[in-house]
Amino acid sequence: MTKWKRANPNGTRDYLFEECTLIEEVEQKLRRTFLERGYEEIRTPTIEFYDVFAFQSRPIDEEKMYKFFDEKGRIIVLRPDMTIPLARVIGTQRCDTPLKVTYSGNVFRANESLTGKYNEIVQSGIEIIGIDNVRAEIECVISVIQSLQKLKVQSFTIEIGQVQLYKCIVKKLSIHEEEEKVLRTYIESKNYAALSNFIREKNFDRCDETVRLLEKLPRLFGNLEVIEEAEKLASSNEMKMAIARVKEIYEAIDKLGYGSYISIDLGMIQHLDYYTGVIFKGYIYEIGEEIVSGGRYDELIGNFGEMLPAVGLAVQVNQIVKALQEQQEPYERKRIDIMIHYELNRLAEAERLRNLLQKDGKKVEISLCSNLNDTFQFARKNQIVTVVEAKNESLVEYVWNEKWVVQKEGETSCVTFKLR
């Protein structure tokens, strides 16, 4: 029964010291950026009823949820997503809208073994509820670009897609559900040959504008030239409106000077039943992993109450940390400047001295060793060159110079000792 007591469950790991500090720093910098832009915080439980995620257009497969039972036999899950619980809160609490919210927390998904994906990850994100115009998408993109800039993430791009355009094409060509699922994989993977074969097998007229748009869809990625190409082939007002929305977002972001951080990919299709319009994906070139995902989901909150338009995105904190570790100089823990050793009856004076020295910008620690020699050994092992001893009615400062030598001594007050 103790076979696995020294191991971690599949897809999980321990985070130690510098890496743990970096994760916390990334979360806090994201939080500060979002709060500065007017987002308000929401926290939801780590566990939720399975029913919260059990709706037809859910983006997470049931097999990827960690499930167990509560004391009444009801199915509980570790949350596999942050947006859906947030939608539950908005739908059931009848919050006043429009509303801008931010969150951060761990999510859990049971990925297949050997995929290289972790089953527990940290997400920080934003959601804008109650706004159906393009300003909501623009705000999301600006917020995430500024947050990544403040984190000093290098070489990232935010791709902007539009699932509504693809839905219009599928509807106009009367492609059935099962065929559509196959078609979607061809477009997402940019499998041009398979897409061409699909069109041929369906006997679609290759001169038809909608068919031509479908065939070009995987190739429609880049800058505004992509929009111009798509506009020429858009055969309905709905298609034109979907394309125009992406164009508006791109142009607005570009005018702010953020054009180098964004691109368009009209062949990007994710969670088709979940998202209803513009979608986002962010990448860092060096790691090739998704660091941002999101989009417009106008039908989600209606599963829990009143139908409300919404758009949001999540930042994958673990991937950001991975990128920062590769892009920046190795993180060095700040070395301790001074170690204070004290006799038990001098603890108060040792603490006062520590506080005074820290105000001067020094990194100071109180020794946990029971005698001065052990403190000296600890200091040498950790490259600490100054030790202060608080004993009897005096303070003594030692410095390492081939051996421990007394630098100053005899002061009874930590204030005058520091000033000497």
UniProtKB/Swiss-Prot annotation:
Involved pathway(s): Amino-acid biosynthesis; L-histidine biosynthesis; L-histidine from 5-phospho-alpha-D-ribose 1-diphosphate: step 1/9
PROSITE patterns, sorted: AA_TRNA_LIGASE_II
GO biological process assignments: histidyl-tRNA aminoacylation; L-histidine biosynthetic process
Isomerase listed as a keyword: no
Entry GO CC: cytoplasm
Localization (cell): Cytoplasm
HAMAP family the record matches: HisZ (MF_00125)
Note from the entry: This function is generally fulfilled by the C-terminal part of HisG, which is missing in some bacteria such as this one.
Function according to Swiss-Prot or TrEMBL: Required for the first step of histidine biosynthesis. May allow the feedback regulation of ATP phosphoribosyltransferase activity by histidine.
Protein name, as recorded: ATP phosphoribosyltransferase regulatory subunit
Organism annotation: Bacillus cereus (strain ATCC 10987 / NRS 248)
